[in-house]
């Protein structure tokens, strides 16, 4: 069975489910895996920081609110935060041209904020495939904790 995660969303699943998110450009996918329970989650983050916005926000959209939300949901299912294996994929520079690096560096900002939140929460970032300028698909196998990354141009790697 396969669960699909949309932009600014997350899904939880347990073995033998595969959780997939498509279209990771400047967005970052963060997977969480609890090996003892064979329980996992995949979060598709769109923006780094919710504090720049007002009103009712979807916490899954942002690194600073989405990562803590998913960890809480996993803990409700019996996961131990200290056992979670975290992997991160995406954060590409999808825009080019004059000023693109300084103005539109959403991918790099997403990567930086994810790393900060993961470290602040005391989580273990065990692997990542980030940056560059190509879109990615991310698939978490809840039977093993392996993450398959498909990069545009027929490149496939397992992290």
Curated annotation (Swiss-Prot):
Listed under catalytic activity are: L-glutaminyl-[protein] + H2O = L-glutamyl-[protein] + NH4(+)
Enzyme class, UniProt record, top EC level: hydrolase
Q: Which UniProt keywords apply?
A: Chemotaxis, Hydrolase
Q: What is its EC number?
A: 3.5.1.44
What molecular functions are annotated in GO for this chain?
protein-glutamine glutaminase activity
GO biological process assignments: chemotaxis
Which Pfam families does the protein's record reference? CheD (PF03975)
The record's function comment reads: Probably deamidates glutamine residues to glutamate on methyl-accepting chemotaxis receptors (MCPs), playing an important role in chemotaxis.
HAMAP family per UniProt: CheD
The identity of this protein, by name, is: Probable chemoreceptor glutamine deamidase CheD
This chain's source organism reads: Carboxydothermus hydrogenoformans (strain ATCC BAA-161 / DSM 6008 / Z-2901)
């Amino acid at each position: 069975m396969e669960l699909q995660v949309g932009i600014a969303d997350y899904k939880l699943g347990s073995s033998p489910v595969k959780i997939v998110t498509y279209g990771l450009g400047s967005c970052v996918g963060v997977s969480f895996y609890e090996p003892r329970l064979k329980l996992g989650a995949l979060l598709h983050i769109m923006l780094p920081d919710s504090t720049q916005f007002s009103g009712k926000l979807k916490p899954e959209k942002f690194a600073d609110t989405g990562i803590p939300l998913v960890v809480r949901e996993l803990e409700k299912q019996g996961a131990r935060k200290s056992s979670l294996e975290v992997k991160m994929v995406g954060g590409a520079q999808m825009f080019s041209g004059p000023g693109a690096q300084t103005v539109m560096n959403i991918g790099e900002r997403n990567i930086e904020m994810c790393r900060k939140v993961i470290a602040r929460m005391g989580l273990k970032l065990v692997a990542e495939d980030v940056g560059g300028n190509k879109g990615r698909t991310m698939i978490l196998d809840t039977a093993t904790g392996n993450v398959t990354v498909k990069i545009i141009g027929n490149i496939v790697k397992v992290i």
